[in-house]
Structure formats: structure tokens, C-alpha cells
Amino acid sequence: MTDVSMQRILLDTNVLLDYLLHRDDHAKMAEAVMELGAKNNVTLLCASLSLKDIAYLSSSAIRREFKPNESEVENFTRSFLSSRVPWRCIEQVKEMCDIVAVDESTCDKAFSLQKRHRDFEDNLIIVAAQQSGANCVVTSDAELISHFPEYCKTPAEIVAALE
């Protein structure tokens, strides 16, 4: 049964990366958030600034995993994957989520949160979520959760609310 207060949730970059790149033990919980969100007609949101991080970090993950070597075939494959995987990750996010713009107003409001939380990028996520009418931000960032406990939830908390 869906928690009525969870109809619009913004996914932090770390949760999206966990899902897309199947990162460690966080991937299963991120996948559960996506599945339960879809099953319960929850609108999943993504801040536009997360897209550039997803593109960069997914390409970096490929390059880190597959180091250049003497094999022409392996080097071609590495180059091919590092150029294609980021685009596919962005496509997947766009299929799953509504993209929320980050504009000058978002930046100004994020700047005003610096006494509460010193990470400007995180503050952009918080403000983008608020401006889009999101009920919460789903994140694995413990510090962000501790600074915005009323607004930030772990993937496990969202799964519990949506089951």
C-alpha cells in the first residue's frame, strides 16, 4: 500500500548510480525503490544536474574497470563502452524519471542553505526537489540525511513506505 505522502520523490545522484551501475550492496535497495515506485504510481524525479554526474561517473567506471593495454580489440571495446554506456544511462533515467530543472532561483536558494549543509551540490538537489513539489529526497548520503532529516529518506525507508 502506497504511503500517500510519497507520490513524488526525487532520487539523489547516488541512488541513481547505485541502480544504473549495480554498485555494491546498495544496488538491490535502489532497484526496489524503482520497482515499488513504478508499481505504486509514484512519480520519480531526477535533478538535471544529476545527469552530468551520471554521464561522467558511468564513463569513468568503465575506464577504471578496463585499463588500456596492448590488445587493440580490448582498447577499442573500452573506448566503445566508455562512449556508449553514459548515453544509455541517461536514456534509462529519462525513461524512469521526470527531469527537474536547476536554474538561477535554485542556485540562489541552495546558496542560502550553506549554514545548514555545506555541500552546494547537495543543496541544489534539496532545493530542486522542493521546487518540483517532491515529498522527499531519496539518498544514501548520511550527512545529507542528518542535516535534512525531515526531508531526506534512505532507500530502505522508501521501500518500507511503499510496500
How does the language model describe each region?
Residues 1-49, 57-67, 132, 146, ...:
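Short, well-structured N-terminal submotif of metal-dependent ribonuclease cores
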Residues 11, 46, 102, 139-140, ...:
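A conserved hydrophobic position in a structured secondary element of the catalytic/binding core
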Residues 28, 108, 126-127:
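A broad detector of short, well-ordered amphipathic alpha-helices
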Residues 31-117, 149:
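PIN-domain endoribonuclease scaffold, especially VapC-family toxins
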